[in-house]
């Protein structure tokens, strides 16, 4: 009886999940254009993200649902919750940037466009309330040709 061989495609999602839980870099290929925001230690470079979108750190913190001062202190900026929220935001923006016409337009969509499938909530409000997973599933469904 032949054993089924595991492919890297089958292992990759688990590695991404494990890496995300460990705080290591785990942006998917869909977010590759935004992966330049990851430093050598595997943390999201907060200042780089803020500069890239023309925001202050306070505005960026508000965008991901954290306190205004959170991103100014290194220990808090590197905390698991902070890094997780940043990665979720970057992944979602990375997924829609090609559809939106660029990362700036994707950020505008993220912050302001109501999504009917989620009761007209924005992607920003979904990430803030911890519902990035269902939003990613929804975006995957749309990418595969599904209806909104």
Model regions: which residues?
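Non-transmembrane "mature" sequence context
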Residues: 1-148
């Amino acid at each position: 009886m032949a054993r089924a061989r595991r492919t890297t495609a089958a292992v990759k999602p688990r590695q991404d999940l494990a890496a995300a839980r460990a705080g290591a870099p785990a942006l998917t290929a869909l977010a590759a254009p935004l992966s330049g925001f990851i430093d050598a230690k595997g943390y999201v470079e907060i200042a780089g993200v803020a500069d890239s979108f023309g925001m202050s750190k306070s505005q960026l913190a508000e965008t991901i649902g954290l306190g205004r001062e959170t991103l100014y202190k290194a220990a808090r900026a590197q905390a698991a919750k902070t890094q997780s929220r940043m990665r979720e935001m970057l992944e979602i923006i990375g997924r829609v940037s090609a559809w939106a016409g660029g990362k700036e337009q994707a950020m505008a969509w993220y912050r302001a466009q109501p999504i009917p499938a989620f009761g007209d909530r924005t992607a920003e409000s979904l990430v803030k309330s911890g519902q990035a997973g269902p939003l990613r599933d929804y975006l995957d469904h749309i990418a595969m040709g599904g209806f909104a």
